[in-house]
């Protein structure tokens, strides 16, 4: 049986065919950073979480969180932990994935997602769902995200400039006023002249001429379902990762279709139901948490993220059958070569392999390099 086309397509090419705007953005980010690594930041304090996000952010494309295990988590919409993570995501170029594993009736999971003390939807680009309660939970989460997004039908970006015109500018100003009335809307935005320039040569009455400054308001209107306008680093905005626009406001869902833990109950019927639910909600479901690619139909374009990834110690790093034992608590580990190169996943999720290293930043780079190598070798196979 021929491999699915997504296994041979580059991430850049898949960004062009993705059905979800956030998936398209993520593939672009992966291609730009040469990274398909997700850090599972399972740490006990908000301070540690923010520190890791800042230090390891350059190596990853996704940061996976468990907000409810973090002491010191604050929920202020502008200065809270989620808001600070969002700022670091902009700075270093990664998406935030809250590993909430919603698993209740539809009404309950929608409230957990859009409300409560944490307001997950406000700061997490991606969440996931356990399909045990059935497809209704996926539909309810999608509805909650849609209602949340409807509060932002478009972004209005406003800039105000105040200045005194030069003599050479009067002819151009006059032409522009003749061509377009103040406050007229054109294309992406509107430019309104609040105070017209007034130049008065009062030589006739013996008084000195004067110029009244112009206040100009510029507005740009942009759909939130599309990526935001690129910030120009040259203009001094260093808060956005260079080379790519800001992530869309659209929210995305990953369905927990398979697990890496020993003895889990996610059988073939469960996995198939997960795939069917994803196909029914392509406008919200980005893909899966799985152990292999689940793209089987020609139109399937889902992204796959896989936990349980670990490398042998560096001095023992060699190609094996891909298995690297377990942790004694049910977790089973495999190498990036097996998960991405052979099983066809797209993003390796790594936690303790990085967090427990003597130098987590250096180890994150080792995992990033190994996962990317597995992807590039898959393209050539």
Swiss-Prot record:
Cellular component aspect of the GO annotation: cytosol
UniProt xrefs under CDD domains: OMP_decarboxylase_like (cd04725)
Catalytic activity: orotidine 5'-phosphate + H(+) = UMP + CO2
Enzyme class: lyase
Binding site for substrate: 42, 64-66, 99-108, 333, 352
Region Disordered: start-end pairs: 311-333
Annotated active site: 101 (proton donor)
EC numbers, comma separated: 4.1.1.23
InterPro entries xrefs: Aldolase_TIM (IPR013785), OMPdecase (IPR014732), OMPdecase_AS (IPR018089), OMPdeCOase_dom (IPR001754), RibuloseP-bd_barrel (IPR011060)
Pathway: Pyrimidine metabolism; UMP biosynthesis via de novo pathway; UMP from orotate: step 2/2
Lineage top rank: taxon: Eukaryota
Alphabetical UniProt keywords: Decarboxylase, Lyase, Pyrimidine biosynthesis
BP terms from Gene Ontology: 'de novo' pyrimidine nucleobase biosynthetic process; 'de novo' UMP biosynthetic process
Pfam families reported in the protein's UniProt record: OMPdecase
Gene Ontology molecular function, alphabetical: orotidine-5'-phosphate decarboxylase activity
Family under the similarity heading: Belongs to the OMP decarboxylase family.
Name the record gives this protein: Orotidine 5'-phosphate decarboxylase
